[in-house]
A protein has these predicted regions:
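Pocket-edge structural micro-motifs
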Residues: 50-51, 202
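Glycine-rich beta-strand-to-loop/alpha-helix junction loops that act as flexible
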Residues: 49-50, 70, 97-99
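Alpha-helical cap/lid subdomain in secreted, periplasmic
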Residues: 61-63, 78-230
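Conserved beta-strand elements of the Class I
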Residues: 47-49, 65
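N-terminal secretory targeting modules
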Residues: 1-47, 55, 59, 87-88, ...
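Short substrate-entry loop that stabilizes the transition state in hydrolases
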Residues: 56, 73-74, 104
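A short beta-strand-loop structural module common to alpha/beta enzyme folds
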Residues: 63-76
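Short glycine-enriched loops at secondary-structure junctions
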Residues: 51-54, 179-181
Length: 230
């Protein structure tokens, strides 16, 4: 896992890099999860599950619980979905992941396996009456180092089309922060939105954060899909 964290664009503290024996990162938030109280009757609790992009995001709404881990892939998120999402009793989960899958951070990852892992998380969420927001992959940029060698612009765009279709078919809300971050001609992230070519910088997160909040509001306001009660 140390290699996993080094392979991601930004290495953070122990809160975002699990120890080598904790492949799924269950120990990263395990003790924190145990201390979180059940939501109050009127609380609109939201859990944000993701990789580096989510781990580095900041939300000031106290009902938002960030469970992003740098270097993670969708199979790792699936393993910790019960602990880091279901056990916290949210109304909504925002799922963001896939860039590290196609980057080969934890082994080979394909468009198909990303969708399969998301489908499994969607099934778990529906079974526990949790509404789902599916986030797009963010663009990357070769402005500092070569990011598109492992994460080609065409592959990112194709996966996002698949994620949008998946969200539509399953009744999830699709969160598109790819479009406002991308330069249309090159299909790479606009230079003003990144310092390293992989993660958004402060200006990039200023674009992403309100889009996340808007998508959550949309999920809360929408009629619950069949099989969901909330």
């Amino acid at each position: 896992m140390a290699l996993c964290c080094l392979a991601s664009a930004q290495v953070k503290t122990d809160k975002s890099c699990p120890p080598p024996t904790d492949w799924a990162g269950l120990n990263v938030f395990g003790s924190d999860d145990a201390e979180i109280r059940p939501p109050s009757p009127n609380e609109q609790r939201v859990v944000l599950l993701g990789d580096d992009v989510m781990a580095n995001a900041t939300f000031h709404n106290r009902s938002y619980i960030n469970r992003g881990i740098a270097g993670q892939t969708t199979p790792q998120m699936l393993v910790r979905f019960r602990q880091d999402v279901i056990a916290l009793n949210p109304k909504v989960v925002v799922i963001e992941g896939g860039l590290n899958d196609i980057g080969g951070v934890a082994g080979p990852g394909t468009e198909g396996t990303i969708t399969e892992n998301l489908a499994s998380m969607m099934d778990l969420a529906k079974a526990h009456d949790i509404r789902v927001v599916i986030a797009s992959l963010s663009p990357v940029c070769d402005c500092v180092t070569n990011q598109t060698g492992r994460r080609s612009v065409g592959r990112i765009a194709a996966i996002n089309h698949g994620l949008q279709d998946f969200a539509r078919q399953t009744g999830a809300v699709y969160l598109n922060y790819y479009t406002p971050l991308v330069e249309a001609r090159t299909r790479q992230m606009k230079k003003e939105f990144t310092n390293d070519g992989f993660l958004p910088n402060a200006a990039g997160y200023a674009v992403i954060t309100p889009l996340v909040e808007k998508a959550v509001a949309q999920a809360l306001a929408a009629k619950a899909p069949e099989g969901q009660l909330k």
